[in-house]
Curated annotation (Swiss-Prot):
Residues covered by region (Disordered): 92-137
Protein's recorded name: Sec-independent protein translocase protein TatB
Keywords linked to the UniProt accession: Cell membrane, Membrane, Protein transport, Translocation, Transmembrane, Transmembrane helix, Transport
Main location: membrane
Membrane topology of this protein: Single-pass membrane protein
Species, as recorded: Mycobacterium sp. (strain KMS)
Main function: Part of the twin-arginine translocation (Tat) system that transports large folded proteins containing a characteristic twin-arginine motif in their signal peptide across membranes. Together with TatC, TatB is part of a receptor directly interacting with Tat signal peptides. TatB may form an oligomeric binding site that transiently accommodates folded Tat precursor proteins before their translocation.
Gene (UniProt): tatB
Superkingdom classification of source: Bacteria
GO biological process, one term: protein transport by the Tat complex
Bias (Low complexity): 122-131
Membrane-spanning intervals of the chain: 2-22
Length: 137
């Protein structure tokens, strides 16, 4: 529940509570807040237990689409495309078409790259003039 609140934010909340409520009422406010959170957690767990008892095995059938939606929410666009359009084959994105799921294809070795001599660029000769078209400008 408080996964996004760090220690710095907690310290600021405590200092703000100390300033607003004062040192006399702050322990009572903390106690009341913790009791309210505990009671809310008990209500939620009780509702979950009651749903499981009422629905029985059908409760798991209700949970499956929800967990699938949670998986989709956490996906990146690349992972979603890979999963749904390409059936998990990400060679389109990685460029490794000869490999299946990160492993080399059966009976295939490392590809041999041909060695080509380096090509040197020749500087343009100064005697040739650059073509100029007065109508183009």
């Amino acid at each position: 529940m408080f996964a996004n609140i760090g220690w710095g934010e907690m310290l600021i909340l405590v200092i703000a509570g100390l300033v607003i409520l004062g040192p006399e009422r702050l322990p009572g406010a903390i106690r009341w807040t913790s009791n309210a959170l505990r009671q809310a957690r008990d209500y939620v767990s009780g509702a979950t237990t009651q749903l499981r008892q009422d629905f029985g095995p059908e409760f798991e059938d209700l949970r499956e689409p929800i967990t699938e939606l949670q998986k989709l929410r956490g996906m990146t666009p690349r992972a979603a495309l890979t999963k749904h359009l390409l059936d998990g084959d990400d060679s389109f994105f990685t460029g490794k078409f000869d490999q299946q799921n990160g492993k080399p294809a059966a009976g295939q070795e490392k590809p041999v790259t041909p060695v080509n001599p380096p090509v040197t660029a020749t500087p343009p000769s100064e005697s040739t003039a650059t073509p100029f078209d007065s109508d183009a400008t």
